[in-house]
Amino acid sequence: MRVYKFGGASVKDANGVRNLEKIVRLALNDQSSIVNRPIVNGLMVVVSAMGKTTNALERVVDLLDAGKEEQALTQWVDIIDFHVAIMKELGLQPGSDIRLQGEIPYDPNLPYDQNYDQIVSMGELLSTQIIAVCLLKQGLSVEWWNMPRLLRTDDTWREAVVDDQTSREVIRAGWNRPNRPSVVVAQGFIGGTIDGQRTTLGREGSDYTAALLGNYLDAESVTIWKDVPGILNADPRLEPDTVLIPSLRYQDAVELSYSGAQIIHPKTIRPLENKQIPLYVKPFGDPTAEGSCISAQGIGPIDVPVYIWRKNQILITMRAKDFAFVLEESLSDIFDIIHRNHLKVSLIQSSAVTISVCVDNTRFVPAAIEQLKTRFNVTYNDHLSLLTIRGTTPEILEQAKKGRTIMLSQTTRRTARLVVKEE
């Protein structure tokens, strides 16, 4: 079997859904070079929320948390209308083909993060229902899976930890039962607790879902369909003259993802590497193109400089309040606060009396800064980006610094990291 994952940009409108159908049909009729037969009864389609739906649903959560119920309802109606328009363009009947939820699944007595998971998960539930019904009406053998009932997690809201053993058993049983349809459509990004609460796996977690399903079901391959030709050495929206990296090793992919490369979710590689399952990244608009392949046989190390931008960063610097500064103890205190406040660290630098950390600038940062101030003198700079250059040279580094305000830099033999003011 194979696993195909489609991101929100790929299914942002009716034309995207039609192209997904085309790719699915190609897969079902494809004479695979690996198994030398078409994929029969063996295609798992993992789908994210459509377009910018996740961002819109996050806005609903924020408005409700701020007590702005009317604005939240207006935003919610806009989200439903967006999906209804796509359904109608695809010839589907809202309300009969697909049941729409009128009420926002919000409980003011629950913590923010728990409400977040109940509301934001609606994006994937909507998109997959639309796609499953569309494929079914086009004559394909299709089944829709409700992943919150199948992918078991704990209740770490927004960063749920998957119960591998239980999830594997349940998913394998569902997949291996007699007369299962040829195509299964499942949500990425979301799972569920033992008591039926929906959870999310972290931003961009649909890739991780696809990798887990590939591992559980012993897939011959997992393919992520993107709006780019494959894995590039830079974001084409930010850097001109990008180069396709056709083949790379699991290790290189892990390093790129943890540096902030958004082409692959950081957790994606491990489940695939454990079973030596190749991961393909292919262009959604050109399904017959080769794209990129990540595997144990990948070519490495990467022989072109790779530019990775991580936006919306804040640089927090902590200075000792007195001279009784012990680095190890201070780091322990700092990372305890960072962990308790769910901050994502992208860079660390220390000196004799200061420690600086660069983190994603989320709503949790102000509380963390206040807690850090109880132990340290704290300063910070926001509106920053982190540029990581793998495979750098003095010439490349000098060019990267031109015209930019550098707040902090780190350089090793082959990697440079620059914290810069956002332009």
Model feature map: region roles:
Residues 290-423:
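A conserved regulatory-domain signal marking ACT and ACT-like small-molecule sensing domains
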Residues 247-295, 300-302, 311:
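A conserved active-site cap/scaffold subdomain adjacent to cofactor or substrate pockets
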Residues 140, 277, 343:
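Short phosphate-binding/catalytic loops that engage adenosine nucleotides
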Residues 49-51, 228-230, 283-288, 298, ...:
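Glycine-rich beta-alpha junction loops
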Residues 177-193, 256-280, 317-331, 381-402:
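Electropositive, surface-exposed helix/loop patches at the edges of structured domains
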Residues 1-264, 269, 421:
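Nucleotide/pyrophosphate-binding catalytic subdomain
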Residues 221-225, 279-281, 346:
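Short hydrophobic alpha-helical runs that function as membrane-insertion/retention elements
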